[in-house]
């Protein structure tokens, strides 16, 4: 069940002095968090305070004192979320959001004491990400995809459209695996941020942090072919000059791609090679990281290429590579 419980009424914050808007603005401007992350914080806070209003019998928060919250209310909030089928990791994230807001209240002088300063956020083991094996990846990129990219989806109405979509999709998949992009980074990628001659891409990730990631030769070749077809496509369509397009990956009308389209095309193509439930762009990002570590890349370098701000985020992949090392050991060591 989705965690859309405790939707606040339009009058919930009427007369309230809680500086939620100021807190969210700080997250956006000073901490450079992405709009989606700020929205997640906002949703978490609104759900928490909506629950409190219901629990305390308040029509709005005009008379609410944030210091009156106790561990009892926090536990009841968690219990209510569990009852509604909210996942444990989502609950932990919501508590972390509330804890961060209360820390802001204390630092800005709105409250003197916060029970959240001594309240530990529940920690749950991170899921080991799914990935394609080296054999699956080789078969997909070197056999299935080159043979007939259009075989994965409904063909376009004419050869010109088909050629454009085919090469665009192929280069998207190649780049996702070659450089481990997030879907937002792929969609937002601009032509000037891609250097195919020197083989690298400049990415702007979470928190607007920039990084440079190598692009493999196979992806470079696919992108060069795509740009060639793209130029011809927009010239023949007479819908504008392809050189004027800002973004690398666009629709047939020249507009920037949207997330659902990339999710959909990735799922269709990857169905041919894996039966994993989540066949999304992140599967290729996980595959990128896992294959690098399997081939001996050091954790810090992989973390930099993924754009992780914390090395512990990258360490989840070491579980996968450790299992591979154990398999190699069992096969190679005489006393294994």
Curated annotation (Swiss-Prot):
Location(s), subcellular: Cytoplasm
Keywords: Cell cycle, Cell division, Chromosome partition, Cytoplasm, DNA integration, DNA recombination, DNA-binding
Gene Ontology cellular component terms for the protein in this record: cytoplasm
Recorded GO MF terms: DNA binding; tyrosine-based site-specific recombinase activity
Catalytic site: 182, 206, 282, 285, 308, 317 (o-(3'-phospho-dna)-tyrosine intermediate)
Domain Tyr recombinase: 127-330
Function: Site-specific tyrosine recombinase, which acts by catalyzing the cutting and rejoining of the recombining DNA molecules. The XerC-XerD complex is essential to convert dimers of the bacterial chromosome into monomers to permit their segregation at cell division. It also contributes to the segregational stability of plasmids.
Family: Belongs to the 'phage' integrase family. XerC subfamily.
Protein name: Tyrosine recombinase XerC
Annotated organism of origin: Pelodictyon phaeoclathratiforme (strain DSM 5477 / BU-1)
